[in-house]
C-alpha cells in the first residue's frame, strides 16, 4: 500500500511556483495533489526530506492561520504542509456528481487521501476546528499513520447521536450560527454575506484578538470557492442529523459513532478566551486520549489558536516531534 502511495505522490500533478521565486519571496510553494475526489491545493515549506507536519485549518479560516507557526518548524528541519480544506481556496471537486459534503468523515478521508497522494507513510498532525476534526479522526482510526497530534479545542470528533441533547442556554446562544445554517434563510445569508458573516464569527469567537481588516481579507478570499456554501451548510446540518451523509463515507461515520480513543502522543491546546468552544478547568475529555497526553490552557486566546498563539502551537509540535510528549 505504501509503495502505491509513494508512486501516487511522485505522479501527483502539482502547480508550483518556481523554486527560485519562492526563495526570493519567502512564501510557501502552492501545489496541488489529486485524490479520487478532489484536487487539493496545499502550501509547502521546508526541506522535502524533512519529517512531514500537516497543519489543518478550520471554519471559517484558511492556511493563513499557520503563517507564524510554519517558520519555526521549517527552521527545525521539518516539512510543513498546509492544505486548503474542501470548499476553500483553490481546492476543487473533480466531479460534479460528488456530494458537496462537509461531514466529519469527509474531512478525515480527505486528509488520509492527501497523505496517500503525497506518499507519506506517516506525519505529525496539527489542527483546530474542522481541521482539528480531520486530524483527530485520522489519529483515532489510522494511528499507524500519525507520529503525534496537536489538537486545538480538544477531541474534535462529533457525537452525532448525542446532538439531540440540549446544551446549557448560554452555550446554545453561542451556537446560533449553526441553527441559522439549518434554515434556507441561513443558506441564503451565507451565500449573500459570507465575508461579513465570517468576520463576525472571528470577532465573537476571539474577543481578545484585535485583528485588522487586511488580516481577515487575506483569509476571506478562500471563502469565495464555488463549493464553500454547500460544504458549510451540509456540515452543520449533518452533525445534527438534519442532512444525509455521503453514502461512500458511511462506514467511517459508523466507526466514529463509537467515539474511538486517540492513542498517539497528543497535546490539546485550549484558549481560555474562546467565545464558542468555552474552556473549563476540568478536563472532561482526558479519557478519550489513551496515549501520552497533555492539555494546556492558554490565557486570553480565542478559537483560532494557531493564529493567536503561534509560539505555543509551534512549541507543542516541536516538543512532541522531539519526543517530549
Where are these regions (language model features)?
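Short acidic-hydrophobic surface loop/beta-edge motif
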Residues: 29-35
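Flexible "cap/lid" subdomain of the alpha/beta-hydrolase fold that forms the substrate-access gate
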Residues: 23-28, 39-40, 52, 88-126, ...
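Catalytic histidine-centered segment of alpha/beta-hydrolase-like enzymes
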Residues: 301-309
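Conserved HGGG/HGGXW glycine-rich cap/lid loop of the alpha/beta-hydrolase fold
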Residues: 45-93
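C-terminal alpha-helix
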Residues: 316-324
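Residue-level recognition of beta-strand->loop/alpha-helix junctions
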Residues: 84, 297-299
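A short loop-to-beta-strand scaffold at the N-terminal edge of the catalytic core in hydrolase folds
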Residues: 36-44
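N-terminal export signals
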Residues: 5-22
Amino acid at each position: 500500500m505504501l509503495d502505491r502511495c509513494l508512486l501516487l505522490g511522485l505522479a501527483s500533478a502539482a502547480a508550483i511556483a518556481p523554486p527560485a521565486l519562492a526563495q526570493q519571496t519567502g512564501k510557501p510553494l502552492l501545489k496541488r495533489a489529486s485524490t479520487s475526489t478532489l484536487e487539493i491545493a496545499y502550501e509547502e515549506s521546508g526541506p522535502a526530506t524533512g519529517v512531514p507536519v500537516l497543519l489543518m485549518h478550520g471554519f471559517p479560516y484558511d492556511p493563513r492561520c499557520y503563517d507564524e507557526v510554519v517558520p519555526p518548524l521549517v527552521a527545525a528541519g521539518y516539512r510543513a504542509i498546509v492544505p486548503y480544506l474542501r470548499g476553500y481556496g483553490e481546492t476543487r471537486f473533480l466531479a460534479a456528481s460528488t456530494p458537496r459534503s462537509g461531514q466529519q468523515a469527509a474531512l478525515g478521508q480527505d486528509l488520509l487521501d492527501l497523505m496517500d497522494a503525497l506518499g507519506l507513510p506517516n506525519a505529525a498532525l496539527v489542527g483546530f476546528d474542522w481541521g482539528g476534526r480531520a486530524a483527530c479522526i485520522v489519529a483515532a482510526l489510522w494511528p499507524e499513520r500519525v507520529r503525534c497530534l496537536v489538537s486545538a479545542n480538544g477531541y474534535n470528533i462529533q457525537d452525532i447521536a448525542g446532538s439531540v441533547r440540549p446544551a446549557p442556554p448560554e452555550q446554545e446562544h453561542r451556537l446560533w450560527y449553526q441553527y441559522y445554517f439549518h434554515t434556507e434563510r441561513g443558506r441564503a445569508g451565507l451565500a449573500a454575506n459570507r465575508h461579513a458573516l465570517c468576520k463576525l464569527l472571528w470577532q465573537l469567537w476571539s474577543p481578545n484578538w484585535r485583528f485588522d481588516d487586511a488580516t481577515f481579507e487575506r483569509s476571506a478570499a478562500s471563502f469565495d470557492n464555488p463549493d464553500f456554501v454547500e460544504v458549510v451548510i451540509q456540515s452543520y446540518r449533518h452533525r445534527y442529523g438534519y442532512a444525509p451523509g455521503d453514502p461512500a463515507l458511511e462506514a467511517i461515520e459508523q466507526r466514529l459513532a463509537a467515539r474511538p480513543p486517540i492513542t498517539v502522543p497528543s497535546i490539546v491546546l485550549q484558549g481560555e478566551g474562546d467565545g464558542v468552544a468555552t474552556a473549563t478547568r476540568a478536563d472532561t475529555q482526558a479519557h478519550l486520549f489513551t496515549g501520552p497526553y497533555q492539555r494546556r490552557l492558554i490565557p486570553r486566546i480565542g478559537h483560532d489558536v494557531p493564529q493567536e498563539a503561534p509560539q505555543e502551537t509551534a512549541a507543542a509540535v516541536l516538543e512532541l516531534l522531539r519526543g517530549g510528549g
